[in-house]
């Protein structure tokens, strides 16, 4: 069985290790930066951006890959699984549409609201920091601030842990919007969960 793992982080290293402990499995990898641990385990490594869908699909076809495991969210967001499946290559990871629950925080919150999932936090999305300030004030600064898109686990900031008070919260909202952190000039703010 030829297995391709996309991604070069610790999560993917653990997956690669498990693949190599399986009988009759051959590991191939795609990663942006070389992870020496994954390199040692792999029959072959393609050093490439994990969002380069065309290169990943071509590599998978060339190596006659039976199954692809995608670790990071960014390749899921750009539809790597969708393209692999169009080319008859199986993947155990979600399609772009299924991964949206992880890649778009606003969409996820709206989905939960639409289906009346219990335990919803109060939230709003903003493209204007002045309007966001009112929402932050309503919660006395006790909020979580989340860029809408992917930030590699580095974008969410929570009062008490990452900022203190309304002024610092608004400053981070301004930064997210002006710098388009997460790829969009938009931020999701929700009440802080205790």
PLM regions and their residue ranges:
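Short coil/turn connectors at secondary-structure junctions
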Residues: 1, 24-25, 64-65, 87-88, ...
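ATP-binding N-terminal substructure of ATP-dependent carboxylate-amine bond-forming enzymes
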Residues: 1-97
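Glycine-rich beta-alpha junction loops
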Residues: 33-34, 149-151, 193-194
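Structural motif corresponding to alpha-helix initiation and N-cap regions
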Residues: 50-54, 129-130, 166
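Conserved ATP-binding module of the ATP-grasp superfamily
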Residues: 67, 110, 118-121, 142-144, ...
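Glycine-rich loop at the start of a catalytic domain that most often binds anionic cofactors/ligands
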Residues: 80-87, 106, 158-161
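A conserved helix-loop-beta module that forms one wall/lid of the active-site cleft
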Residues: 92-155, 160
């Amino acid at each position: 069985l030829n297995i391709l793992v996309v991604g070069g982080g610790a999560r993917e290293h653990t997956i690669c290790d498990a693949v190599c402990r399986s009988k009759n499995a051959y590991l191939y990898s795609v990663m942006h930066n070389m992870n020496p641990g994954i390199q040692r385990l792999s029959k072959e490594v393609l050093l490439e951006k994990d969002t380069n869908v065309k290169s990943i699909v071509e590599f998978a076809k060339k190596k006659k890959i039976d199954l692809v495991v995608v670790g990071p969210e960014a390749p899921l967001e750009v539809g790597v699984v969708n393209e692999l499946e169009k080319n008859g290559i199986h993947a155990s990871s979600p399609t772009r549409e299924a991964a949206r629950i992880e890649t778009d925080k606003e969409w996820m919150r709206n989905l939960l609201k639409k289906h009346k999932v219990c335990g919803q936090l109060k939230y709003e999305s903003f493209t204007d920091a002045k309007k966001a300030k009112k929402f932050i004030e309503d919660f006395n600064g006790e909020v979580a601030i989340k860029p809408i898109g992917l930030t590699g686990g580095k974008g969410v900031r929570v009062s008490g842990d990452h900022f203190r008070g309304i002024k610092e919260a608004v400053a981070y909202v301004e930064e997210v919007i002006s710098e388009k952190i997460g790829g969009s000039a938009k931020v999701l703010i929700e009440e802080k969960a205790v």
